[in-house]
Amino acid sequence: MGQEDGNRGERRAAGTPVEVTALYATDGCVITSSIALLTNSLLGAEPVYIFSYDAYTHDGRADGPTEQDRFEESRALYQASGGLNGDSFRVTFCLLGTEVGGTHQARGRTRPMFVCRFERADDVAALQDALAHGTPLQPDHIAATLDAEATFALHANMILALTVAINNASPRTGRDAAAAQYDQGASLRSLVGRTSLGQRGLTTLYVHHEVRVLAAYRRAYYGSAQSPFWFLSKFGPDEKSLVLTTRYYLLQAQRLGGAGATYDLQAIKDICATYAIPHAPRPDTVSAASLTSFAAITRFCCTSQYARGAAAAGFPLYVERRIAADVRETSALEKFITHDRSCLRVSDREFITYIYLAHFECFSPPRLATHLRAVTTHDPNPAASTEQPSPLGREAVEQFFCHVRAQLNIGEYVKHNVTPRETVLDGDTAKAYLRARTYAPGALTPAPAYCGAVDSATKMMGRLADAEKLLVPRGWPAFAPASPGEDTAGGTPPPQTCGIVKRLLRLAATEQQGPTPPAIAALIRNAAVQTPLPVYRISMVPTGQAFAALAWDDWARITRDARLAEAVVSAEAAAHPDHGALGRRLTDRIRAQGPVMPPGGLDAGGQMYVNRNEIFNGALAITNIILDLDIALKEPVPFRRLHEALGHFRRGALAAVQLLFPAARVDPDAYPCYFFKSACRPGPASVGSGSGLGNDDDGDWFPCYDDAGDEEWAEDPGAMDTSHDPPDDEVAYFDLCHEVGPTAEPRETDSPVCSCTDKIGLRVCMPVPAPYVVHGSLTMRGVARVIQQAVLLDRDFVEAIGSYVKNFLLIDTGVYAHGHSLRLPYFAKIAPDGPACGRLLPVFVIPPACKDVPAFVAAHADPRRFHFHAPPTYLASPREIRVLHSLGGDYVSFFERKASRNALEHFGRRETLTEVLGRYNVQPDAGGTVEGFASELLGRIVACIETHFPEHAGEYQAVSVRRAVSKDDWVLLQLVPVRGTLQQSLSCLRFKHGRASRATARTFVALSVGANNRLCVSLCQQCFAAKCDSNRLHTLFTIDAGTPCSPSVPCSTSQPSS
């Protein structure tokens, strides 16, 4: 091998000189010394230290050399004892700096100062001594070998710029100053044509303008201020990193190009750490701490074994191999994410979680350690490299992406993420369960007039109180209604309170005991009623809420103007054998009839035929799967395309139903699925001001009645989980911009366009297949999410409507919380300025194998098809029922499950809120302790409000605390103005709303567990206006509760209410 290296050295000596790029320094100011050398003023020049260098040759080979050839050629440059092989050298001396001017390549990190040609024996010997042992080069050697032409070509632009700046030259025309004009075509070079740009020009400038010349060069060569300690701290501290990283990062990367030229310093140092080349101990005992001068650091680097031989020759090649291995393994991640971006139909928030999880799974510390062990080499020779194939990409696919692939198949998704739990009832037990847990058969049977209790919220509270007075002697619990802002500061805590909704739902679901009339008979004043009964919320005009519990109703009055005669349906079915065309034709006929809103009245009894929202009762069984679809749009959807998409939606939903209810017989080609869509608005002129659209509440917030509003949180706070679940917004905020369609009867070929521009509101109703019923809010929420997953995995659905949709969070699951409500089909919503709009009308999606089209069309108007708790058709004689009471598993989100597992594995267990509050001597289960603790923290919260929201600070001077939601890791407490104060409501802190009715907001203090298991106290608000996301909870600021032993904080202005 030595003979071969010698032959290569002889061939090189006869050819071109060895190219050397040297990073140098001096003991004093390197810029002053360098200019002295350039101007041939050797008295001001200092010896030059070369502490890092790069050597290469230009062989001019036409064929690209292999990696092994490059290694051998590079190793042949280095002498075993130090220095370089060769008889002549062209050395470019550099300092830290950047070349001026744009380029498509990576910018260099050094800037050349002068070029020298070492050809004479004594000069070459001096250079070899400097490279091998760190001996400083004397100024006379630099001056004797200076290549003036090449050197001053580097400085021509600098000399020219200095000449122009010093002489204030500018290109202009005109003989005097008054006539002078700027000449854009004039060349600056023509103005300084008599100025020498070589050594003479620089010398002249330096002699006459030394300060400006030094300042300019110091700005251009910002390496002039670097000290030995700077280089040691940046590129060290160990010997290998100091020598190899400095050489590659500053000198070799730009010359070699490739990805390495774009890597930052830390990345190169990380690569250097896996270049584990063995070497003998240094003969000296020099430590990094002793390298306090350039003489010491130069001697240390030049005598290092990493600066010569195979170790020096192999490192640049190893950087290329290591980068290629990293990119190869990580590109699998990029490819999967790119693929999933177009086919993994999840919400934006969930996809972001997926991206973070993918990177965490692939680049977790254990996997990275395995990868680094695989790519570590112990031999610089590429032919003998000890690197192994890295398992990083393969493990990422096996451990993460294979599970993600399972999300793209609904069967695998249910298999891995859903564990249904059901209870089987038969005979009399099944019959008794259905009678006790579904609406009484007469409740949804058409009748000439309604029977029930209907009244405004205020009057309903009084009627409930009167009914409860009759029931209390018979064992009914007493509830005292709480008025908004009730002041309890000066006395005993108030009696137990409960809102309208909870009391109504409890009355409506209570069974009849023997011959005694049911409890709700005391409210309805009719002993013949049977329970359970449906409970409704009604939006009044212009504002306010009403409530109803109905034993029966005149359903024909509600649906008669939006129904088709059986003869018409039969005729259309005979004329249009294609069910898709038939469904669109029948839908167009409904629209062409011009359904009008039933006349409403100022009283609740009339208004309930305009707007009605079924309140979900968590105590009852669910017999109809009612889905609330809110499709956010990029642009309007052609109706034909929308209708086709709904057909694909039906197919995907039924695929999920078959998997969730395996004991049921579900024929996907014949099973009924009913669709209703909010009527399109005819135009802005008919709807009112655009600012009013979208502000109506189709959900559960009762702005005028805090006790009713509190009921929204009473049973199932999970519906508004702002920490983990996707936002569950109510349908009213999305549907309000829709109105009744045109009256003209379009032809099928017209392909009408749905005029909804922002969102499409839909109801999808499917009977729970016999013999199943569903029980529980969480179970129903899980069913809806599995159905959404199945629909989004239907390729035809995504292709049909995907280009029109902004995001794929389609189904709102917040409606399945106890006490939440959902607008019924055939009813409208109430716009903020009063008129009813957006009536939900049928869209007929006829099953492919439907045998009786008229019956299917008529079933859309059957109230038993679109109520959550309607009595099933087999109620009279059920042989067996299966109660699905839990989906178990992690159906909520595969990505959330992975995130939770990773957090536990890598960051330790997060304490529960109960454990954290226990350190403050607060017991969440003990009455009033959490409220009292929050009251103590109010002083700090009010101080923040005074600082950041000074105009609202006065509203919080007299507030009390009332618990709203309690969870294992989250407690929400509402701030309520004390009764009797001037301010009886709290204003929105996020925005200034034009309308006073929109300025009112509910304000909460949230207690949660933050990082490092510390207690976090957040101020949150829920504002009704669309500008504030329509009742969505927003966190305004968060403070740290401090350590339990910290001094007590200022207390609030009143005692907490229970």
From Swiss-Prot:
Effect annotated for changing residue 211 to A: In strain: Nonneuroinvasive mutant HF10
Zn finger spans (CHC2-type): 988-1028
Residues of the site described as Essential for primase activity: 628, 630
GO aspect biological process, one term: bidirectional double-stranded viral DNA replication
EC numbers: 2.7.7.-
Places the protein is found: Host nucleus
GO terms for cellular component: host cell nucleus
Main localisation: host cell
One Pfam short name: Herpes_UL52
Molecular function per GO: DNA-directed RNA polymerase activity; zinc ion binding
Highest rank taxon of the organism: Viruses
Sorted UniProt keywords: DNA replication, Host nucleus, Metal-binding, Transferase, Zinc, Zinc-finger
InterPro entries: HSV_PRIM (IPR033685)
Function: Essential component of the helicase/primase complex. Unwinds the DNA at the replication forks and generates single-stranded DNA for both leading and lagging strand synthesis. The primase initiates primer synthesis and thereby produces large amount of short RNA primers on the lagging strand that the polymerase elongates using dNTPs.
The family this protein is said to belong to: Belongs to the herpesviridae DNA primase family.
Assembly and interaction partners: Associates with the helicase and the primase-associated factor to form the helicase-primase factor.
Name by which UniProt lists this protein: DNA primase
Species per Swiss-Prot/TrEMBL record: Human herpesvirus 1 (strain 17) (HHV-1)
